[in-house]
Amino acid sequence: MKLSFSLKNSFKLTALSSLFGCGLLGLSLSTSAQAEGKLVLYCSVQNTTCEKVAHAFSKKYNVDTQFVRNSTGTVLGKIKAEKENPQADVWYGGTLEPHFQARDAGLLETYRSPLQKEIMPQFKKLTEQRGDTTSIIYLMELGIGMNEKLLAEKNIAKPQCYADLLKPEFKGLIQYPDPRVSGTGYTILTTLIEIMGEDKAFAYLKELDKNIAQYTKTGLATANISTGAAAVDVGFMHTYVREKDKGAPVIGALPCEGTGYTLGAV
């Protein structure tokens, strides 16, 4: 699948989305899918984390908690499509901007978590202004992940910069999260625009497209670089640490041009 860069105007740097609830606590939501003793969770973090969150809530409150795991953009699309007949009670995880978009579209219930008072000082203003439907629950840094064993076998130097990924030796070796459906992909896009400027960022992505083996629907498909299905990935640093901890020859690098971060929400 190749991206159409005529979509440029749809990715202007505008603040997008939010949701409701906070952490594992009082996740009271929309007027819909609430059946007595049952809670449906749309989850945009790793599947294992979704399982742990659902289990912890079920155990603490004696509520049958079920989850559906999708990328941030996919969940936002589902919530929009289900506006007149909501199918879930809580949206847990995923990048903050799509949560704000849901808030601005009136898709979320008002709920301000009492835990917001514990937020890091630099995010207090944002929380005060837009925390009426969502809460920040984590922070993640962007980086370049790579299978160092596969790169060594191909005699390719480890990429340290976004610019390195344009080199011809990386043709067919890179996977990249599709910014149309992936919150990770959107965060990479906005970071590149911040670093390079809008026109240069889209020119960069058009050039990078020549080296892309596949566009993934989620930024969490890092198992592909562990198995060698891809040699290089652009995503969040913690995902590469997780693969390395499993024993895979995977490392991450913070791009030399600078990097961005995202806030996760519930």
Model-found features: residue ranges?
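Periplasmic-binding protein-like
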Residues: Y204-L208, A213-Y215, K244-V266
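A ligand-binding cleft/hinge motif common to bilobed small-molecule-binding domains
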Residues: E97-Q101, A231-P249
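Bacterial N-terminal signal peptides that target proteins for export
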Residues: K2-L19
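Residues embedded in well-ordered beta-strands
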Residues: V40, G143-G145, G260, A265-V266
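C-terminal segment of classical bacterial N-terminal signal peptides
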Residues: F20-S32
